[in-house]
Amino acid sequence: MRLMSALTGIAFVTSIAMASSALAQSDCTKTVPASPWGKEDQTGATNRITPAVTKAAAAEIKEGKVTSLTNDLVDGVPLFGTRFSKTVLTAGGLAPGAGLGKNDLTYMEDTWLSQSHVGTHLDGMGHIGRGDCYYNQIAMGKNINQNNMTKLGLEHLKPFQTRGVFIDMVKVYQQANKLKSNPNCRTPCIDKGTVITPDDLQAGLKLTNTTLREGDVVIIHTGWVDLFLQHPAKNTEYNSGEAGLGKAAAKWLIDQKIVAVGLDNWAVEVIPGESQDEAFPVHQMLLTDNGIHIIENVRTDLMAAQVASSGRGTFFFSMTVPKAVGLTGTFVAIDAIQ
């Protein structure tokens, strides 16, 4: 076992070295745009969250009502590909005679074995590239080690305290009489393979009389979250595809200078995609080319009900992102405050 572990470690380090030497020669100026915030930028679109933007967003808080946009993170939720997540409880302090001191103090702890892109999570800029080239023309092959990235880690992001804008795409499709739901959904949902267009986004904004402004985070409800909430029974169906952003819709959002976009599915963009020859092109458009963050597996059903009741599609968006050095993504906790 020790020999196998050693060989595995050697193989991993060797692969890193090969990647570094082979890919570090990339001329990323030819494949990825430069950041508008300068050649040293690793912050991306969160540069748009200025004190003035946060202060203006705080005006959205009228009653102090808090609605969660976060799915429970628990064993058994749908996971993409070979990703894993498992919790193990250590309750040694509860064993007979294990209490500490005269006051019989006991304790429990957890071991959390999980990849970072699980549950409601943020895709960082180091998650997606074009070949060796990542956000702001960074050649990633020479900026990684066995443990993490040395550039584009989550520690460079500004706090996500800004205005959120909610778009109920289910209502848009219902009003246009083009909703094709999935029979596995208990509530209306837009079926997989449906391309969300710029016209769809603008129709959704019109429902709440909202105009996007620089620094916003956009959250889109497709109803697909209902399959996530039926875990593990509907995990296969949840992972089989999704409605999502097409490339034109992504371009339109980029032009609005948003900070991030999140959907109630596992990839944000339409699956199956618009072209069989491309893999996750919207990810590259948003993250690699523009530093706009992606939030996946957002819980949108509660907010959809809230917006339907109040008619307000804007809110104070508060998302906690750990200062996780060198990580490509992370679980997040998101609250919508009105």
Could you say what each language-model-derived stretch is?
Residues 24-338:
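Active-/binding-site microenvironments in catalytic and ligand-binding cores
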Residues 1-10:
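Bacterial N-terminal signal peptides that target proteins for export
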